[in-house]
UniProtKB/Swiss-Prot annotation:
Cited function: Involved in mRNA degradation. Catalyzes the phosphorolysis of single-stranded polyribonucleotides processively in the 3'- to 5'-direction.
Name of this protein: Polyribonucleotide nucleotidyltransferase
Region described as Disordered: 704-743
Catalytic activity: RNA(n+1) + phosphate = RNA(n) + a ribonucleoside 5'-diphosphate
SMART domains listed in its UniProt record: KH, S1
Cited InterPro entries: ExoRNase_PH_dom1, ExoRNase_PH_dom2, ExoRNase_PH_dom2_sf, KH_dom, KH_dom_type_1, KH_dom_type_1_sf, NA-bd_OB-fold, PNPase
Any single Pfam family the record assigns to this protein: KH_1
Length: 743
């Protein structure tokens, strides 16, 4: 028997969300369906009973998958089957993971798998905004330990009005697009892009989102109570020795605090911290360490964390010796590589990005074929994080989720600065060569520099900064950190990235690890971030006051032209013959498409002459021949009665033997005209029925003195008469124009 339980959430605008459990996937630890309109997601959670031996972290795995059948489509590819996760699916996984992960108990180390699947969609409501709610609700109806519930919503500002979970159409018109994850009481995660908005406007969007989330969390608690899952399973994943914990603290804390306040570099500081714990472990035998090593590592990590936090809260001293508002030293180099179309190095402290820009044509557009999004992207940003950037000795595998997420943040920070009518496809590639925190923000800064070096006329330069937080007593005592290090991110309470121009914010990403973060702290963090952003922007402008006024010599050139829709077929030709010929003859690349009832042609090449040649050929094709005009032409074939001349691309006319010269020729061979020869011709007439062109060469030549116009051919007169009175003229022999009638 089914025991179906459901709750409905009213969004207050005529729409509602239904959460249901007890019908599908009943063997999972928890399973719910979330329905909004015709959009249906299934979320399931399963957890191992015991932790893996030696595991000291939260092994959470979140998967999000969209079925093409949800919208009635076939997948692409040879197999016609869903394959590896798309970038969009990976980004949705990360949004859910970042909101859930901090709320599992610190000492819970069993593997947890969260799967969210889109089974139905209508192309109107956005399913990624429901994935966090679905995942949390599945945990709520399970017995897996979880300090939730949470929910996630998207908030967009459209025409000055904040909308919760907007439609695809509404989002296209929004100047604020925020995804917010939160519990009933606290913001946990924020990510979004904006069109140069003020800090207060972004905060208002977060407030609107949190109010909607509170309603959704309440519905989950009611659902959990209805299915009797308020009591969670018992577990014991850590072995503790309180005497050992105290011993580690007593013997290591003072030395760790000294290292935390020494102001040394990343590797020197790491070695100093490592030396302390190694000397502590030296007092134990190998047999004792086999039992205690894992606990010692865990307790010493807590000592390091406490030392760093106390140094900041009590003395205002950071690990590298900076003040809380201080930005690391910055050095910049642009035009550093001869091959790319644009390049820049941005180094901030021990974080360095080498970023390049490649300019391409329409054929370089990226085709996006997601379930609910079929489009082409003209601005790409790729972020690479090789192991050597942190000094790690391990192989470099494929692109990971972290790289996709960091690249997406930098992409959103810069994309609104690319002019909408920019003719080039732009690819920005950031290779992180050194990393000690804020590498995604270094990518934004280096991306701005490289784009300007490439001659891309971006609307405004963009800079970015990562902020941190150290707090205690529910946020009553706190310190906000500008331009955080990797250790400050790891040991702190917040990672808050903000990008923007001098006029406002373009993108943000925030992850909070503690309860009780007030809006006052967020306001202060945003204000401090603004000061940091503007400082970094000043350094960028010092190094590169202006955008390069032209592209580099080896960058492709692009010209656009518009033609009537009716000429598109003529330019392409049968089987693409004409357009391929244009490309072969000119050396340029030609792309054509119909836009708003017009043919839009993009001509690109490595130099201006090849582009001009292609443009000339296209103009010739679309040009309308005018009677009386003179055209340069080329003889394409020679016939007994005259020559065919191509006087415009794709347009041929007959040059009759009688129109070659004022002189009379008996045969076409007497004219000495050859196939392939170039001559000038004048268009005499266009047949109104057949559209055939009648050409003349002789009218362009000077008429000989004493020239007498030939008399009308007798043959034609007699032939007309013959049609009335019979065929009585001689067909054989004699001059063609003076044939004698038969006896």
């Amino acid at each position: 028997m089914l025991n179906v339980v459901s709750k409905t959430i009213d969004l207050g605008d005529g729409r509602s969300i239904k959460i249901e459990t007890g019908k599908l996937a009943k063997q999972a630890d928890g399973a719910v369906t979330v329905t909004m309109g015709n959009t249906v997601l299934l979320a399931t959670v399963c957890a191992a009973k015991d932790a893996n031996p030696g595991c000291d972290f939260m092994p959470l795995q979140v998967e999000y998958k969209e079925k093409y059948s949800a919208i009635g489509r076939f997948p692409g590819g040879f197999t016609r089957r869903e394959g590896k996760a798309s970038d969009y699916e990976i980004l949705t996984c990360r949004l859910v993971d970042r909101a859930l992960r901090p709320l599992f108990p610190d000492n819970y180390h069993a593997e947890v798998f969260v799967n969210v699947i889109l089974f139905s969609a209508d192309g109107e409501d956005m399913p990624d905004a429901l994935a966090g709610l679905a995942a949390s609700a599945a945990l709520a109806v399970s017995d897996i330990p979880f300090n939730g519930p949470i929910s996630e919503v998207r908030v967009a500002r459209v025409d000055g009005r904040y909308i919760v979970n907007p439609t695809f159409e509404q989002l296209e018109r929004a100047d604020i697009d925020l995804m917010v994850g939160a519990t009933m009481d606290n913001i946990m995660m924020v990510e979004g892009e904006m069109d140069e908005v003020q800090e207060s406007e972004m905060l208002e969007g977060i407030r609107v989102a949190h109010e909607a989330i509170k309603v959704q969390c309440k519905a989950q608690l009611e659902l959990s109570e209805a299915v009797g899952k308020l009591q969670k399973r018992e577990y014991s994943h850590e072995v503790n020795d309180e005497d050992l914990r105290k011993k580690v603290h007593d013997e290591c804390y003072a030395r760790a605090y000294e290292v935390a306040t020494s102001g040394t570099g990343k590797h020197e500081r790491g070695e100093a911290f490592e030396k302390i714990v190694e000397e502590f472990k030296a007092q134990y035998t190998e047999e004792e360490l086999a039992e205690k090593a894992e606990m010692i590592a865990r307790y010493y990590h807590d000592v390091e964390k406490e030392a760093m936090r106390r140094a900041i809260l009590d003395e205002g001293k950071r690990l590298d010796g900076r003040k809380t508002t201080e930005i690391r030293p910055i050095w910049i180099e642009t035009d550093c590589l001869p091959g790319p179309h644009g390049s820049a190095i941005f180094t901030r402290g021990e974080t360095q990005s080498l970023t390049t820009v490649t300019l391409g044509t329409k054929s370089d557009e990226k085709l996006v074929d997601d379930v609910l999004n079929y489009t082409k992207e003209r601005f790409l940003l790729h972020y690479n994080f090789p192991p050597f950037s942190t000094g790690e000795a391990r192989p470099q595998r494929g692109v990971g989720r972290r790289e996709i997420g960091h690249g997406n943040l930098a992409h959103r920070a810069l994309k609104r600065m690319i002019p909408t009518d920019y003719p080039y496809v732009v690819r920005v590639i950031s290779d992180i060569l050194e990393s000690n925190g804020s590498s995604s923000m270094a990518t934004v800064c280096a991306g701005t520099l490289a784009l300007r070096d490439a001659g891309v006329q971006i609307r405004k330069p963009v800079s970015g900064i990562a902020m941190g937080l150290i707090s205690e007593n529910q946020g009553k005592n706190y310190a906000i950190l500008s331009d955080i290090l990797g250790d400050e991110d790891h040991l702190g309470d917040m990672d808050f990235k903000v990008t923007g121009t001098k006029d406002g914010i373009t993108a943000t990403q925030m992850d909070i690890k503690v309860d009780g973060l007030s809006y006052e702290i967020l306001e202060n963090a945003l204000e401090q971030a603004k000061q940091g952003r503007l400082h970094i922007l000043g350094k960028i402008m010092e190094a590169q006051p202006e955008t390069r006024d032209d592209l580099k010599p080896h960058a492709p050139r692009i010209e656009k032209m518009h033609i009537g829709k009716e000429f598109i077929g003529a330019v392409i030709g049968p089987g693409g013959k004409i357009i391929q010929g244009i490309q072969e003859k000119s050396g340029a690349t030609v792309n054509i498409e119909e836009v708003d009832g017009m043919g839009v042609i993009e001509i690109s090449g490595t130099n201006k002459p090849c582009i001009d040649a292609a443009i000339g050929m296209i103009k010739g094709i679309v040009a309308m021949p005018e009677v009386g005009e003179t055209y340069p032409g080329k003889i394409t074939s020679v016939m007994p009665y005259g020559c065919f001349v191509e006087f415009l691309p794709g347009k041929e006319g007959l040059l009759h033997i009688s129109e070659v010269d004022w002189k009379r020729f008996e045969t076409i061979e007497d004219t000495n005209l050859k196939e392939g020869e170039s001559i000038n011709v004048k268009l005499l007439d266009i047949d109104p029925k057949t559209g055939k062109f009648k050409l003349s060469r002789k009218v362009l030549l000077e008429k000989p003195e004493g020239y007498v116009e030939p008399q009308p051919r007798e043959r034609r007169e007699r032939r007309e008469g013959g049609r009335e009175g019979g065929r009585n003229f001689e067909r054989r022999g004699g001059d063609r124009d003076h044939r004698e009638p038969r006896g």
